[in-house]
Amino acid sequence: MTSSFPHRRHAVRRPLAALLGLLCAGLATAGPSIYPEGTTRLDPARAWPSFVLFTGGDQQARLIDLDGRTVHTWPDVGGFASTLLDPALVHGERGHVLVTLENVDGRGVDLVPGRAGPQVSRTIGELDWERQVRWRFGALAPEGLAQQHHDWARLPDGHTLVLSNLRHAVAGFRQHDILDDVFYDVDESGAITWRWVASEHLEELGFTPAQLALIRESDNADFLHVNDLKPIGPNHWFDAGDARFAPDNLIFCSRNANVIAIVDRHSGHVVWTLGPNYPAIPRGTAGRRVPRPVDQISGQHDAQIIPAGLPGAGNLLVFDNQGEAGYPPVDLPTTGGSRVLEIDPVSRQIVWQYTAEDSGQPAWAFRSTHISAARRLPNGNTFVDEGQSGRLFQVTRDGDVVWEYVNAYPRLGKDPVTGKATANHQLYRAQPVPLDWAPAGTPHSETALRATPAATGAPR
């Protein structure tokens, strides 16, 4: 389960290969020359049995089991990520995915001001298990381009929530055209029925006048870089009378501005925010004790209200990258790592967190300054996508890693300066998928693969 540049070996699940992978795992963020690939750890008694969906460097949406074996693919779906849909949202049919169907090259047409040569989504859509298109969006979008990025969600009424970019001029900004973030509600025909534009609500996001001035004078046209958009979903806060958490309200986060916010779907107003200004993370062990007030979040991803029925339901779960962000950029620890935070959204207390130290490693052993995700699982584990290194894992509430997988399908290329072969294992986002969301009879296996303390360098 290793790859060696310039050649990558196929991921074969063998004890020796797994051991080599584990020996390298602590170095993953430093970019070792021998890279672990495939499943490197599995405790079937404590891991939640599931499939996992991700889009690798080979541009295939790939469904794997916990042994790391591919059970299904949807080829040629380049883009940010793929999402397998809850059958309850697609008339009980299993195995439908949201994917990017078609990209266009942004060079020369100024689709993304301030960036060189990006790929921009022209069309996104829904594919069934047989890879047939069941829904699409793009032709009826502005300029005939979906410009979807980062996130999307199928809604209970059959519509689709889409996070997109909108290139336009906005008065008061230094940039002639900004790359705005826009939320669309798209119906079954691909028509936009509702939209929300971020630049129209900057004054509602908690920025000081000085911060608003920095944003408007920024050289970065992608000034907010919203990377997450989800409906709140049913929750006990709303049931108790707190209208801010209405199930159809929307939660999003801005990576560049260190803000998490909730939008009232009916009024369009921002009704709840976390950030952009936080106290510093306490030094030493005080920064690991919970509960405590929320402290400095920076460059975060995948903010969501934990769904009803799961452990921690109603709390906010977020991958806190601790990447450079903020207006102005916030101070960050020189040798720090990333965190997964569970936050009570009303008291604004951190009630649980995960760092590498909870697994007996130095803080920097778990670090992804960009991309990444975290999801709560039915058995109380948390699924984590350490996106920068392409490492996926399940961790218990006590910090035990009970399943671990490293992307075996990196993006291969050539260095523009040296001409040497390159491999990039990063995964923007991966999704844990319940076994019964795939068609009946889809094969899966969960075979124990145990790491010894001598192999990991950390007690388990």
Predicted features, each with a name:
Residues P15-G26:
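Bacterial N-terminal signal peptides
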Residues A30-R460:
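Histidine-/acidic-rich catalytic cores in large beta-rich domains
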Residues M1-V12:
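N-terminal secretory signal peptides that target proteins for export/translocation
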Residues H10-R13, A17, H269, A374:
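Intrinsic structural disorder/low-complexity segments
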